[in-house]
């Protein structure tokens, strides 16, 4: 299980990303726009740099929803491969069964 502080920090990052998402999208749109003046693009670049680091969605880590394991997570299920295997063997995941041939 991951440290509770790491899980809490990741949840805090998700909130910050959500808070600044609209502003980031607006600034990035200005940066990519070829019709925008160089001054406007420079201003957008500086505005993007002034946002908090944690406002970038790339800093959010995909973690296991149950124990917070940071690696080997299945996005479709939201759990780690280890947890997935255990739950599948116990029959807790409907429609998932061990293959044999």
UniProtKB/Swiss-Prot annotation:
GO MF annotation: an example: rRNA binding
Top-level taxonomic group: Bacteria
Gene3D superfamilies: 1.10.287.1480
KW GTP-binding (keyword) present: no
GO CC annotation, single: small ribosomal subunit
PANTHER family: 30S RIBOSOMAL PROTEIN S14 (PTHR19836), SMALL RIBOSOMAL SUBUNIT PROTEIN US14A (PTHR19836:SF23)
Subunit record text: Part of the 30S ribosomal subunit. Contacts proteins S3 and S10.
Record-given protein name: Small ribosomal subunit protein uS14
Source organism per UniProt: Kocuria rhizophila (strain ATCC 9341 / DSM 348 / NBRC 103217 / DC2201)
Gene name, Swiss-Prot/TrEMBL: rpsN
């Amino acid at each position: 299980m991951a440290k509770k502080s790491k899980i809490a920090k990741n949840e805090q990052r998700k909130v910050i990303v959500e808070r600044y998402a609209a502003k980031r999208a607006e600034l990035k749109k200005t940066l990519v726009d070829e019709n925008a003046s160089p001054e406007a693009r420079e201003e957008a670049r500086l505005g993007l740099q002034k946002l908090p680091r944690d406002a970038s969605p790339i800093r959010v880590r995909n973690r296991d929803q149950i124990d917070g394991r940071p690696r080997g997570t299945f996005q479709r299920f939201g759990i780690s491969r280890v947890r997935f295997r255990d739950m599948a063997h116990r029959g807790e995941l409907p429609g998932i069964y061990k293959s044999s041939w």
